[in-house]
């Protein structure tokens, strides 16, 4: 099986999303989503999902009883649509930043995560460093390169990812600036 997807993992605040941001700055266009902080509650934050195609966002977590909990409906509706739009788009590159615990009960969303990974699209996905069944299955896929920023330097990961994408996207007819 040919490797074409790129997974990035590592402990909290190690630079996973910054790495993705630096990599995609080199591209003309891409589909998918990123997760961004919405509201800060001391040491913890709620989050929203931002759709790169439609340039819209929706909350994916909320603060309840002194803890942050996911909003499964956000993944089953907005998240699912975001990934479906990515599949239907002309973009060769799809970003999923990040996959974690909030969406683990959203079967519709997880179905489309797998559809995107199984598609001809090239995926860059940030994977939360937690032992969650669906995340472990993704990390063990044979069609993925896995970069653990706890084990490889940011610079080395960046250089290798850019190199791999140059090769992969040349096959697709796209190019990096």
Predicted features along the sequence, with ranges:
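Phosphate-binding P-loop
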Residues: 1-3
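N-terminal phosphate/diphosphate-binding loop that engages ATP/GTP or pyrophosphate donors
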Residues: 21-68
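Conserved acidic residues
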Residues: 30, 92-93, 121, 144
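Conserved lysine of the Walker
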Residues: 16
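Hydrophobic anchor at the beta1->P-loop junction of P-loop NTPases
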Residues: 8
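P-loop (Walker A) phosphate-binding loop of NTP-binding proteins
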Residues: 11
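Phosphate-binding/switch loop-helix module in NTP-utilizing enzymes
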Residues: 66-115
């Amino acid at each position: 099986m040919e490797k074409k997807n790129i997974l990035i993992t590592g402990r909290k605040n190690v630079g996973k999303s910054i790495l993705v941001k630096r990599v995609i700055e080199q591209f003309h266009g891409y589909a998918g989503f990123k997760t961004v902080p919405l509201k800060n509650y001391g040491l913890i934050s709620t989050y929203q999902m931002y759709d790169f195609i439609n340039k819209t966002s929706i909350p994916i977590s909320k603060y309840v009883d002194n803890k942050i909990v996911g909003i499964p409906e956000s993944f089953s509706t907005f998240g699912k649509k975001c990934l479906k739009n990515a599949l239907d788009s002309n973009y060769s590159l799809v970003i999923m930043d990040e996959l974690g615990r909030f969406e683990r009960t959203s079967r519709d969303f997880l179905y489309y995560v797998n559809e995107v990974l199984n598609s001809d699209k090239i995926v860059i996905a940030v994977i939360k460093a937690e032992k969650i069944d669906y995340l472990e299955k993704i990390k063990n896929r044979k069609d993925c390169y896995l970069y653990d920023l706890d084990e490889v330097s940011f610079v080395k990961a960046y250089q290798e990812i850019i190199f791999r994408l140059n090769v992969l996207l040349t096959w697709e007819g796209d190019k990096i600036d």
